[in-house]
Swiss-Prot record:
The keyword Nucleotide-binding does not apply. The modification N-acetylmethionine is found at residue 1. It is found in: Cytoplasm; Nucleus. Induction: Up-regulated by interferon gamma. Up-regulated by theophylline (THP) and down-regulated by 1,3-dinitrobenzene (DNB), two reprotoxic agents thought to induce infertility. It catalyses: Cleavage of peptide bonds with very broad specificity. Its main location: cytoplasm. Autocleaved. The resulting N-terminal Thr residue of the mature subunit is responsible for the nucleophile proteolytic activity. Its EC number is 3.4.25.1. It comes from the Eukaryota. This is Proteasome subunit beta type-10. GO terms for biological process: cell morphogenesis; proteasome-mediated ubiquitin-dependent protein catabolic process; T cell proliferation. The record marks 39-40 as: Cleavage. PROSITE patterns: PROTEASOME_BETA_1, PROTEASOME_BETA_2.
Amino acid sequence: MLKQAVEHRGGFSFENCQRNASLEHVLPGLRVPLARKTGTTIAGLVFRDGVILGADTRATNDSVVADKSCEKIHFIAPKIYCCGAGVAADTEMTTRMAASKMELHALSTGREPRVATVTRILRQTLFRYQGHVGASLIVGGVDLNGPQLYSVHPHGSYSRLPFTALGSGQDAAVALLEDRFQPNMTLEAAQELLVEAITAGILGDLGSGGSVDACVITAGGAKLQRALSSPIEPVQRAGQYRFAPGTTPVQTQEVRALTLELLEETVQAMEVE
């Protein structure tokens, strides 16, 4: 029986870490799965006529870039969109579920869906799974109450803010938004600020990259813009790396004959009734 050597006095508790290490030592073949870093930079802000959302386009698998043109701005309703950070499959399926529910809600009520309704569906779903669904979401849209922007976290908590950013590159993006955001900004100023915020997240985080996608939502509808800006240009090769045959000398060469064994093969006809 393991006993606690030091009395716990508050603060961080590492009892589970000690338990996992003991189980790995006692049980052969048991390995506790490691947590993987999910890299993304998403942001959004409210301007004078609506809401603008932005995201990078890099999808990673641990230290490998899995997709250079990943769509992280998801459709919910004609005037409501959602940015997703975290596990790509979780964000995709969670937003699809919300979009289908809002379509059924609009058909049954005969009214346009509200941003607060989408946020409630998302946070209740995420709270039900207690954080095991890795989806950090930014919901933005325009309804009868005007432009609204919400951030929803994986455990179900949410906030309504004039601007926000989530993901592994959120520190650089939030720093730029806090410094330059102003109420009642024009569309041009808001779009420029959003692109610079996502670019700051891309340049300051290895998990973020690719180009900048944006979605402008107003009372007249939404406009999704792919590859609005590409902060990182591909590096051009300095020269031609084509070598003529025989450039690399052959030190030794050996030819071995393969021993083949001939097997007898028979084919039997299948009985057909």
